[in-house]
From Swiss-Prot:
One of its GO terms (cellular component) is cytoplasm. The lineage of its organism: Bacteria, Pseudomonadati, Pseudomonadota, Betaproteobacteria, Neisseriales. It is found in: Cytoplasm. Disulfide bonds: none annotated. S-adenosyl-L-methionine binds at R96, D97, D168. The keyword NAD does not apply. One of its GO terms (molecular function) is rRNA (guanine-N2-)-methyltransferase activity. Its EC number is 2.1.1.242. It catalyses: guanosine(1516) in 16S rRNA + S-adenosyl-L-methionine = N(2)-methylguanosine(1516) in 16S rRNA + S-adenosyl-L-homocysteine + H(+). Belongs to the methyltransferase superfamily. RsmJ family. This is Ribosomal RNA small subunit methyltransferase J. Keywords: Cytoplasm, Methyltransferase, rRNA processing, S-adenosyl-L-methionine, Transferase. Its main location: cytoplasm. It comes from Neisseria gonorrhoeae (strain NCCP11945).
């Protein structure tokens, strides 16, 4: 489990939020590795020996740009957003794609199994709900803490199947490439091994009514070695589309 250092300045809202996740409260930072820091009105991810940190902020910077420009993105075409599908994001991570999808007016159920990442994302959604510019978008995201492959079958029984299951599995870290930003390096170190790709894709194809959309690097291998029905390809990213079991490609 991940350590969390709760500063005296942490608000009651932050203290309440972190109690929802299995984190280990500590009185000082660990000697090495990563930990969460709760201070003021924010939860951040820290790496011992580094000055920078990672927070989930949907109200500014790159997240704001993607939110306001999301309608023209390839992801919008991949999920056929004009049909207003319901989307389950089975690998939510830091929530960037979930937020873009929600900014398109879609209802998104997001799953994240790592407690520290889920805490960071939950905190980002909480703060986005307080901002007039992002509150409507944030309200369309429903975060579930846990393993999507385990939770989706049970959720189908109570809510029915979603139109789309969206997958963005963690790519192998490109250690020699400058393209790996420090934030993602923190993320890789925190999360470690990715979910079982075969089980994840299999469950997604059992769950979706219309399609499974998988985000990959443009030249990356197919998820679980399985070829998709078709693709949407951009300059650096592509979206592989798989049909649900029993669906007719035509």
């Amino acid at each position: 489990m991940t350590d969390i250092l709760i500063d005296d300045t942490a608000t009651e809202a932050v203290r309440t939020l972190i109690r929802a996740f299995p984190l280990v409260p500590v009185s000082q930072p660990p000697e090495q590795g990563s930990y969460l820091l709760a201070e003021h009105d924010t939860v951040s991810l820290r790496l011992v020996g580094e000055k920078s940190n990672v927070i989930v902020d949907f109200t500014s910077g790159a997240a704001q740009y993607r939110r306001t420009k999301g309608g023209g993105e390839l992801i919008a075409k991949a999920v056929n957003h004009t049909a207003h599908p319901t989307v389950w994001d089975a690998t939510a991570g830091l929530g960037r794609d979930s937020f873009v999808l929600a900014s398109l007016g879609l209802t998104v159920t997001a799953f994240e199994q790592h407690p520290a990442v889920a805490c960071l994302l939950s905190d980002g959604i909480r703060r986005a709900l307080l901002n007039p510019e992002t509150q409507d978008t944030a309200a369309r995201i429903n975060l579930h803490f846990g393993n999507a492959a385990e939770q989706m079958p049970a959720l189908v029984k109570t809510q029915g199947k979603p139109d789309i299951v969206y997958l963005d599995p963690m790519y192998p870290e490109r250690r020699k490439s400058a393209a790996v930003k420090k934030e993602m390096a923190y993320f890789h170190r925190l999360v470690g091994e990715a979910q079982d790709e075969v089980i994840l894709l299999h469950t997604a194809r059992q769950t979706a009514k219309k399609r499974v959309v998988v985000k990959r690097p443009r030249l990356g291998e197919h998820l679980a070695g399985q070829a998709p029905a078709y693709q949407y390809t951009g300059k650096s990213t592509r979206f592989d589309v798989y049909l649900p079991y029993g669906a007719d490609k035509g």
